[in-house]
């Protein structure tokens, strides 16, 4: 057989001589490539139609390729004469015949020898052709390049020779092989003769046969298993048959022609092999060229015809695909022969729903592995799945069971919705990152689909949710969950690896016990894959590894690669993939999560402030914030875009419905959003509860795991020690046996030789290991006895002369130490004998008592010795000696304490043993040194042991709960404390003791264990447990847990010990954060500590009791028990900056207690000397703004709700009226630091004041967006009176009030235009009871806590005006250098009335609005005093409006006063007002040197008088204070200042503007932020109107976008008498006008000062008018309500006014200056009253603004004037006015001095009104307008009437 056949059809390698000629055969590859492309196109356009019985639709790709390979191998072994190889071709037999015949003839006629060879081609055997072809391997056919180039068809036929020989090639197919022609560019001319064709490149002959055979082997082979080529095969790619030419001619003429050509070629090649190469003649070549051209044209024509036929076939195939191949039983669904997908469990075909015309998915499932039961279960579940219709669930239409045509194979058909856009997995591969909005949308839809499944009855569990089963519709973006039926089948049908995808399977799925939570777990893994783009657990190599990680709770590695900017996604995934299914979130809970809630759908969010901190604590109260994102909805709310409504919520007691109802009542939210906000709060609280429970469970579980590990380690250690002890015991017995044997031998031998010592056994490890207590009762010799010490009797078993082997002289075994130390103790801990080697006993024994004793070789006398043990028990021991050493045996049982040894023994004391290194001479020196070191270690261990003893002193069961008194004795200190065993936990008590520095950290666990025992004893029998002592010895060197030893009392006398012992009282409170965790902050001294929240350095996870009152042993007083009254629920809402981390409680909502008022001594010179107004200095503000370490830690680490509960309350509120719990705060403001709007134009060095006591903790930082201008006079009188203060921490503010020191000071205070942080109210001692009662009643009314960490700025003034620099903390002494240069005269009390009250809710500051009533008595007193002063001056006009009395509220009682204030102080929404810009300092030196009174006692009088308003004795203080202020202020003014009233307001204004930012510089550095003044205008206006002080002089613009024009010196001339340059001012005492003369909206500042309203829009004007009407209504209502109050307090006015101290002229001048200074106050109006559409005309307004004559005795004359008139001491008020107006150097000519008329004249009436240019304001009289110096109608100023001296406001 030829080599080509034996080699598998591969031809032999061509000869080396012609191997290089094959490179020229690559020219025809282009034609072959085109043919291959045509065949591929045929495959694509017309796929093979397979037999239905053996179709490939049920085979996978791998199986199909394997089948084809088998078929090819089979066909390769079959003969070629088959019908499928000789089918008719659609070729025209007439087209190719001439060319092929002519070429054949040309080849046959070329040489006569070809005929001899041509017979080979007629052979019917296929091998004959092979042999012939093989023999021509070396034949060379002479072709020219032209023939090869111009006749590719001939070359193609020639190239097929080897393919016909090898019977179909390697795989039975015929590739299009070509002989590569030579290049046309390098073509060579014909060479006649014997020269064969030459290669153009090498010049060597071309081996055609070798090239043909090589192409046949190396060309790509194509599969013949393609029916498209069986029916229609191109002529150039048809199979070459090996049949004879005669058969081919009968069947297929084109094939016959082809074979004839090939036969001729083979004959020619054979001839060339035999005869050698020869060249073709010219005629032969011409014929060949012409035939080839004709054949090529005919081939092109056939190709065109084939293309047209293919197009027709494609159309026919498409029609065939639309023909259904199967249908459902009911005929509704059709199946088409179009496979869409294939999986391990199903095959999906395209289907059609004939009812709807929608394409569906026809899924065929294998049923062979389902048993009968599982089929039945699937039928039931499939029926249920048919009813599931949801937009996010792939629709399940129908199912049935079917069989194939033969009926052998059964399968289940599922018809579902067809999803053509792809799966989520495909999208994740296509897009590396998904947009967060898209991710939210997809997750939301997935959760909706799962929620629909889980809410069915029964719930439907998907079981196989993963990204491959989630389908996405690309056109709409909708997501649907699919493969529900498959998940149902996969439940229990297959192996566990097939139940689901291991990466997405929950741990319980492996145990086949699961519920809907497995879908939540799978969703978490899907979300993880969507976020990270990584497959979960891709790091695992097999399902077993995944299983181990899943069940152990190890998260995938990609979990750590979640983007850091999405912490909420990490939290959601963590909640979904928890190991315990009960800890996972449900689908419903995930749907309500904020992350999946679209903002455009709801527009409102509820957030929890400091959520992480609250999760770790047990606070029942959390701070929540409501924010509005929808701009349309925001218009209905009372806060702005960057603000949120913050409120406190008690998760145990509060109800979302109640909280939302309070919001509606306080007009924070509209009614239509009630249900939505209620649901948001409820969902948020439920999620918080669930997360907190999980967090606590995790902490508990971690502790349990640690405890379990520790116990296991202890058990292992104990077992190991026991094993070692057993070994040692065996060694000891062996040694004893040897010793006895040696002793017997020594006794038998009287003159023994020295016996060498026994080799030491390894014992180093035993010496280091502690022995358990049961095994530590045996001891070895630790007491080294001298050989001649007679005081310790020793019984010797054997007397052995102990001689050292290295010494020539004999030495005793027990040699004395060189420096023995006496041991004055009997308490010795003796370890086991086996711990010390026998031969080293003598050297390791401790010295007992000896001096240097000479050694004695004589034998020892054996005696007995008794050694007391640790428990002072005497245990007899027997000491036996031999040459090896000394052994002491001790009985295991310890007897009761025995008498001490005899007098000759060692003296017994309680001092511990103090071992010293004792060099000894023994038989083994190295062992002796090691033994000495061991001895020292043992003694050190003994000295390091400490004992913790707790004794139960008593149990008081008289209360509702038992109260146990205990005493704890430690090495640190002894302390006595009380606790309630029923409610207090040991860990809580121990933590409190540690916080109070009563306990060391190392003793915490011991004390907790002892307290647990105490609680058990008390619970079992409280009386019998009294007197029990629990002792625990703490050995730091031991790994064993300490053991508690209980000693029961012999009598019950110890039960009364608690009455004489100091104690720490731990009182139970609701679970809240413990703030007293710093031992350094609390000292056990004579200071009484009540605060439970003075500090909070870290978040605690356990509940703690309230406060621990630590008393020294000398202080025997008991603390008051906690109040039992019902706690009131105060106001909780506050609008806050929602972006701020609320560190300090913004609203002390739910606060149940108040701080006991701080009492200071009252000076005795209140009315005996001029009352001086205390300065409101920047030092004071600095002090208030400086956060204490306590408050700072509270604000940074503690929850805002942690400080809302107080254990010690001075008020027992029983009312439950809904108060103010909501506050509005900005969302973008920083936690601390002043507002960015505050600037510091004059940065100068700030001098420090050194006369200050040590700093006292103050309030936390507050926000202030306004300006505060406080100026100090150059002079101050430092005369301080030190007072003892009972310092008490506040649970709301964690701050300590400052001592009020009555120190006179000469200062001037400018109008305060910004609220400042405030301290607790300052209370005077002799009115403390009345003040406490009033404070309690007011707080009951308004539901506020007793202390405010952000009270109103007016409280700041009062609390600060009583402070001298001596009382300011050192940390608060940084003040601007400019302070004290430009002061202005103002009464501090009245300044307090100008500052708005903090009770206004919508303050954008960090002030706690609801606690703004702290210090309310100072405000009321200041307002009342100003009212009295105005009445004294007689410059108020009585309003014409009368009172009907229907709203009268009596205020002669505290309840009435509180009710009246409740009418005034209400929840009003306000918008903020920016600060006025800074202005240059235009004042001169003379103006800046104004001096104010020098006595600060006025505030003390004011504070005490107002709180005792119910008492008639306080009227004297009020009048005295008023007169003193008037007199002292006027007396302290320089002459220039008294004659220059116009300079006073200018000085005040300019100095305030100049020093505004500088006065706040220090507060900026202390993380304080200003509060915008305008937000407090509501309460100020209300209170001022109520008490008759209608003063309102704004100077700040209300618009955020507009600024105030800089003040110029021209304003100084315009503000005569206190007029403000930017706004009009009206003074009205008594009955207010029917129409308010004040600006009623923030825009009025701009309207009156800078804008011309004639060009304003009608909407703006309408809003202004509406605001004015609202103000008018409010003022009228307040006036009616308060009129009764005045009548109640007129009669009890005291007559103790000192006429000498009252200067009416000075007081009037002071009032004028005060009125001028008040023009700088930026105040606003309430927004809560309903709008009033009635707009009175100018005439009505003029009438309402007309006031009767000032000082008319018949019409509502002021109270003070009546009293003073009766006393005959009232001066003429016009003198002060005249002195204030006529002496001004800058007064206009119209206001020159003139004799004033009587102020009480009824004929004179001056209208005080506001002059505006908008047509609806009050119209000034022509006379007033003529005198008006203002250049414009919008500029107002104060003028003095030269005729009357009455100040008018134009």
Curated annotation (Swiss-Prot):
* Role, per record: Serine/threonine-protein kinase component of the WNK3-SPAK/OSR1 kinase cascade, which plays an important role in the regulation of electrolyte homeostasis and regulatory volume increase in response to hyperosmotic stress. Wnk-1 mediates regulatory volume increase in response to hyperosmotic stress by acting as a molecular crowding sensor, which senses cell shrinkage and mediates formation of a membraneless compartment by undergoing liquid-liquid phase separation. The membraneless compartment concentrates wnk-1 with its substrates. Phosphorylates gck-3.
Tell me what effect the entry lists for residue 1133 to A.
Severe loss of interaction with gck-3 and abnormal formation of the excretory canal
GO function term, MF aspect, one: protein serine kinase activity
User: GO biological process: what's one of them?
Assistant: positive regulation of potassium ion import across plasma membrane
Biased region (Basic and acidic residues) positions are 284-309, 727-742, 1062-1071
User: What cofactors does this protein use?
Assistant: Mg(2+)
**Catalytic activity annotation:** L-seryl-[protein] + ATP = O-phospho-L-seryl-[protein] + ADP + H(+); L-threonyl-[protein] + ATP = O-phospho-L-threonyl-[protein] + ADP + H(+)
What does the entry's domain section say? Disordered regions undergo liquid-liquid phase separation (LLPS) for the formation of a cytoplasmic membraneless compartment that concentrates WNK1 with its substrates, OXSR1/OSR1 and STK39/SPAK.
Write the protein's name.
Serine/threonine-protein kinase WNK
Result for mutant: residue 346 to M: No catalytic activity. Arrest at L2 larval stage and abnormal formation of the excretory canal
Q: What happens when the gene is disrupted?
A: RNAi-mediated knockdown causes impaired survival and slower volume recovery upon hypertonic stress.
EC category name: transferase
Q: What quaternary arrangement does the UniProt entry report?
A: Interacts with gck-3 (via C-terminus).
Which ranges are annotated Pro residues under compositional bias?
A: 751-760
Question: Which regions are flagged for Polar residues bias?
Answer: 776-790, 1077-1101, 1208-1217, 1806-1820
Coiled coil regions in record: 693-749
Extract the Pfam families matched here: CCTL2_WNK, OSR1_C, Pkinase
Residues that hold ATP according to the record: 344, 416-419, 466
Q: Does the keyword NADP apply?
A: no
Quote a single Gene Ontology cellular component term.
cytoplasm
Q: What is its EC number?
A: 2.7.11.1
Task: Tell me where in or outside the cell this protein is found.
Answer: Cytoplasm
Q: Work out whether the entry's keyword set contains Cell membrane.
A: no
Active site residues according to the UniProt entry:
483
Record region (Disordered): 1-108, 221-253, 272-309, 727-790, 890-943, 1040-1130, 1188-1249, 1588-1636, 1721-1740, 1769-1850
List the cysteine pairs that form cystine. Answer: none
């Amino acid at each position: 057989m030829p080599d080509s056949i034996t080699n598998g059809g591969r031809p032999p390698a061509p000869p080396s001589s012609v191997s290089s000629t094959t490179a020229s055969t690559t020219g025809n590859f282009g034609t072959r490539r085109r043919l291959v492309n045509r065949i591929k196109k045929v495959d694509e356009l017309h796929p093979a139609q397979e037999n239905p019985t053996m179709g490939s639709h049920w085979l996978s790709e791998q199986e199909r390729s394997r089948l084809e390979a088998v078929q090819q191998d089979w066909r390769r072994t079959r003969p070629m004469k088959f019908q499928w190889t000789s089918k008719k071709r659609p070729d025209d037999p007439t087209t190719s015949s001439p060319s092929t015949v002519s070429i054949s003839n040309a080849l046959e006629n070329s040489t006569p020898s070809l005929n001899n060879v041509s017979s080979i081609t007629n052979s019917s055997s296929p091998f004959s052709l092979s042999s012939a072809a093989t023999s021509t391997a070396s034949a060379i056919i002479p072709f020219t390049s032209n023939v090869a180039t111009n006749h590719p068809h001939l070359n193609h036929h020639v190239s097929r020779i080897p393919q016909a020989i090898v019977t179909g090639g390697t795989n039975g197919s015929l590739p299009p092989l070509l002989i590569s022609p030579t290049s046309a560019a390098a073509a060579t001319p014909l060479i006649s003769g014997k020269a064969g064709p030459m290669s153009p490149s090498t010049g060597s002959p071309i081996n055609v046969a070798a090239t043909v055979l090589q192409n046949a082997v190396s060309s790509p082979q194509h599969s013949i298993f393609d029916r498209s080529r069986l029916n229609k095969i191109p002529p150039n790619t048809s199979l070459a048959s090996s049949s004879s030419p005669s058969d081919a001619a009968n069947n297929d003429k084109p094939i016959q022609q082809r074979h004839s050509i090939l036969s001729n070629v083979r004959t020619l090649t054979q001839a060339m092999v035999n005869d050698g190469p020869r060249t073709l003649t010219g005629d032969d070549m011409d014929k060949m060229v012409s035939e080839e051209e004709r054949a090529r044209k005919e081939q092109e024509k056939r190709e065109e015809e084939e293309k047209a036929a293919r197009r027709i076939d494609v159309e026919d195939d498409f029609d065939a695909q639309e023909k259904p191949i199967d249908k459902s039983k009911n005929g509704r669904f059709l199946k088409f022969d179009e496979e869409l997908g294939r999986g391990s469990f199903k095959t999906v075909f395209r289907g059609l729903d004939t009812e709807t015309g929608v394409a569906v998915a026809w899924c065929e499932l294998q049923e062979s592995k389902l048993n009968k039961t599982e089929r039945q279960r699937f039928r039931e579940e499939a029926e249920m799945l048919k009813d599931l219709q949801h937009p996010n669930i792939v629709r399940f239409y129908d199912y049935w069971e079917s069989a194939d045509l033969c009926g052998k194979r059964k399968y289940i058909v599922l018809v579902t919705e067809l999803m053509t856009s792809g799966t989520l997995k495909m999208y994740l591969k296509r897009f590396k990152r998904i947009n967060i909005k898209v991710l939210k949308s997809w997750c939301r839809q997935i959760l909706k689909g799962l929620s629909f499944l889980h809410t069915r009855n029964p719930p439907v569990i998907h079981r196989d949710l993963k990204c491959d089963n989630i389908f996405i519709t690309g056109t709409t973006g909708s997501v649907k969950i699919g493969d529900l039926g498959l998940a149902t089948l996969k439940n229990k049908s297959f192996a566990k690896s097939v139940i689901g995808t291991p990466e997405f399977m929950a741990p319980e799925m492996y145990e086949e016990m699961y519920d809907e939570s497995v879908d939540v777990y799978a969703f978490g893994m899907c979300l993880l894959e969507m976020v990270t783009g990584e497959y979960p657990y891709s790091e695992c190599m097999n399902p077993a590894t995944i299983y181990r990680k899943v069940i152990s709770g190890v998260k995938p590695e990609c979990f750590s690669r979640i983007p850091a900017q999405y912490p909420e996604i990490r939290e959601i995934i963590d909640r979904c993939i928890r190991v315990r299914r009960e800890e996972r979130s449900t689908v419903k809970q995930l749907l309500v999560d904020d992350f999946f809630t679209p903002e455009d759908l709801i527009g409102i969010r509820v957030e929890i402030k400091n959520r992480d901190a609250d999760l770790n604590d047990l606070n029942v109260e959390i701070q929540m914030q409501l924010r509005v994102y929808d701009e349309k909805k925001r218009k209905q709310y009372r806060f702005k875009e960057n603000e949120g409504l913050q409120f406190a919520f008690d998760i145990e007691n509060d109800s979302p419905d109640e909280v939302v109802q309070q919001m509606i009542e306080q007009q924070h939210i509209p009614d239509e959003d009630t249900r939505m906000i209620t649901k948001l709060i409820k969902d948020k609280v439920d999620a918080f509860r669930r997360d907190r429970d999980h967090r606590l469970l995790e902490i508990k579980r971690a502790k349990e795991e640690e405890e379990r590990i520790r116990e296991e380690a202890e058990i292992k250690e104990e077992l190991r020690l026991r094993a070692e002890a057993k070994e040692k015991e065996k060694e000891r017995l062996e040694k004893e046996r040897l010793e006895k044997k040696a002793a017997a031998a020594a006794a038998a031998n009287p003159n023994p030789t020295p016996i060498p010592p026994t080799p030491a056994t390894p014992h180093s490890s035993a010496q280091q290991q502690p022995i358990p207590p049961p095994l530590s009762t045996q001891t070895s010799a630790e007491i080294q006895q001298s050989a001649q010490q007679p005081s310790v009797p020793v019984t010797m078993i054997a007397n052995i002369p102990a001689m050292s082997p290295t010494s020539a002289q004999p030495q005793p075994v027990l040699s004395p130490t060189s420096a023995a130390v006496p041991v004055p103790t009997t308490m010795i801990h003796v370890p086991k004998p086996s711990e010390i080697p026998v031969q080293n006993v003598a050297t390791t024994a401790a010295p007992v008592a000896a001096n240097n004793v000479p050694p004695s070789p004589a034998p020892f006398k054996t005696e007995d010795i008794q050694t007391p043990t640790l428990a002072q028990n005497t245990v007899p021991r027997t000491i036996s000696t031999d040459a090896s050493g000394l052994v002491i045996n001790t009985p295991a049982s310890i007897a009761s304490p025995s008498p001490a040894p005899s007098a000759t023994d060692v003296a017994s004391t309680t001092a511990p043993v103090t071992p010293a290194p004792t060099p000894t001479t023994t038989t083994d020196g190295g062992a002796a040194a090691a033994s000495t070191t061991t001895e020292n270690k043992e003694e050190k261990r003994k000295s390091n042991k400490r004992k913790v003893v707790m004794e139960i002193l008593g149990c008081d069961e008289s209360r509702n709960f038992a109260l146990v008194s205990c005493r704890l004795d430690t090495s640190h200190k002894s302390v006595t404390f009380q606790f309630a065993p029923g409610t207090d936990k040991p860990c809580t008590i121990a933590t409190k003791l540690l916080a109070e520095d009563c306990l060391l950290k190392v003793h915490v666990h011991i004390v907790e264990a002892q307290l647990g025992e105490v609680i058990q004893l008390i619970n079992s029998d409280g009386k019998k447990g009294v007197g029990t002592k629990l002792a625990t010895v703490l050995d730091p060197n031991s790994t064993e847990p300490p053991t508690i030893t209980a000693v029961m009392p012999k009598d019950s006398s110890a039960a009364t010990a608690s009455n004489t012992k100091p104690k720490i009282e731990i009182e139970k409170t609701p679970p809240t954060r413990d703030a007293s965790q710093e031992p350094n902050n609390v000292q056990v001294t004579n200071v009484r500590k009540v605060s439970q929240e003075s500090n909070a350095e870290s978040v605690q996870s356990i509940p703690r009791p309230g406060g621990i009152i630590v008393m020294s042993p000398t202080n025997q007083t008991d603390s008051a028990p906690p109040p039992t009254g019902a706690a009131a629920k105060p106001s909780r809402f506050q609008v806050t900056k929602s972006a701020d981390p609320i560190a300090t409680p913004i609203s002390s909502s739910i606060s149940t207690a108040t701080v006991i008022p701080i009492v200071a001594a009252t000076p005795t010179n209140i009315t005996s000397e001029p009352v001086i107004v205390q300065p409101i200095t920047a030092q004071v503000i600095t002090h208030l703004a400086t956060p204490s370490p306590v408050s700072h830690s509270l604000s940074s680490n503690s929850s805002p709700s942690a400080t809302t509960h107080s254990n010690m309350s001075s008020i027992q509120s029983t009312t439950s009226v809904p108060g103010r719990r909501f506050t509005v705060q900005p969302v973008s403001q920083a936690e601390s630091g002043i507002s960015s709007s505050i600037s510091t134009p004059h940065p100068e060095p700030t001098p420090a004041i050194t006369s200050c006591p040590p700093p006292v903790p103050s309030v936390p930082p507050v926000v202030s967006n306004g300006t505060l201008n406080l100026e100090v006079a150059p002079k101050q009188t430092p005369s301080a009176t030190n007072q003892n203060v009972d310092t008490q921490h506040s649970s709301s503010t964690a701050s300590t009030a400052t001592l009020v020191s009555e120190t006179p000071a000469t200062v001037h205070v400018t109008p305060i235009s910004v609220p400042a942080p405030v301290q607790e109210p300052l209370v005077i001692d002799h009115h403390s009871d009345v003040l406490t009662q009033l404070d309690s009643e007011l707080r009951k009314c308004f539901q506020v806590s007793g202390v405010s960490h952000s009270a109103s700025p007016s409280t700041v003034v009062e609390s600060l005006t009583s402070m001298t620099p001596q009382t300011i903390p050192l940390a608060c002494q940084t003040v601007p250098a400019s302070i004290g240069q430009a002061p202005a005269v103002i009464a501090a009390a009245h300044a307090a009335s100008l500052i708005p009250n903090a009770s206004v809710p919508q303050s954008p500051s960090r002030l706690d609005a609801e606690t703004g009533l702290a210090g309310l008595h100072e405000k009321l007193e200041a307002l009342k005093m100003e009212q009295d002063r105005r009445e004294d001056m007689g410059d108020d006009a009585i309003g014409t409006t009368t009172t009907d009395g229907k709203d009268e509220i009596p205020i002669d009682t505290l309840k009435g006063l509180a009710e009246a204030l409740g009418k005034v102080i209400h929840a009003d929404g306000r918008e903020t007002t920016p600060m006025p810009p800074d202005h240059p300092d235009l004042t001169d030196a003379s103006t800046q040197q104004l001096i104010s009174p020098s006595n600060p006692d006025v505030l003390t009088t004011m504070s005490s008088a107002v709180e005792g308003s119910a008492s008639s004795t306080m009227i004297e203080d009020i009048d005295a204070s008023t007169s003193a202020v008037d007199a002292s202020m006027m007396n302290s003014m320089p002459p220039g200042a008294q004659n220059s009233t116009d300079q006073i307001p200018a000085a005040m204004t300019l100095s305030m503007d100049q020093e505004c930012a500088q006065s706040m510089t220090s507060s900026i550095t202390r993380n304080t932020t200003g509060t915008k003044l305008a937000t407090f205008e509501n309460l100020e206006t209300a209170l001022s109107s109520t008490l008759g002080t209608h003063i309102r002089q704004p100077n700040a613009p209300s618009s955020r976008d507009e600024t105030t024009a800089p003040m110029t010196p021209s304003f100084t001339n315009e503000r005569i008498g206190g007029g403000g340059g930017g706004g009009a001012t009206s003074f009205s005492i008594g009955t207010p006008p029917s129409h308010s003369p004040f600006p009623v909206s923030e825009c009025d500042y701009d309207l009156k000062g800078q804008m011309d309203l004639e060009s304003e829009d009608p909407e703006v004007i309408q809003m202004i008018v509406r605001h004015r009407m609202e103000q008018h209504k409010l003022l009228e209502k307040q006036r009616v309500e308060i009129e009764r109050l005045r009548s109640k307090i007129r009669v009890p006015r005291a007559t103790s006014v000192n006429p000498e101290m009252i200067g009416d002229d000075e007081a009037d001048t002071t009032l004028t200056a005060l009125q001028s200074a008040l023009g700088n106050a930026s105040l606003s109006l309430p927004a809560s009253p309903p709008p009033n559409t009635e707009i009175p005309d100018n005439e009505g307004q003029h009438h309402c603004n007309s006031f009767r004559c000032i000082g008319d005795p018949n019409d509502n004359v002021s109270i003070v004037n009546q009293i003073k008139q009766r006393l005959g001491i009232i001066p003429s008020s016009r003198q002060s006015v005249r002195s204030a107006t006529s002496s001004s150097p800058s007064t206009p000519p119209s206001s020159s001095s003139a004799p004033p008329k009587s102020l009480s004249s009824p004929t004179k009436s001056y209208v005080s009104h506001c002059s505006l240019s908008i047509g609806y304001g009050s119209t000034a009289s022509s006379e007033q307008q003529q005198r008006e110096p203002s250049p414009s109608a919008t500029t107002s100023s104060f003028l003095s009437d030269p005729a009357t001296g009455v100040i008018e406001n134009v």
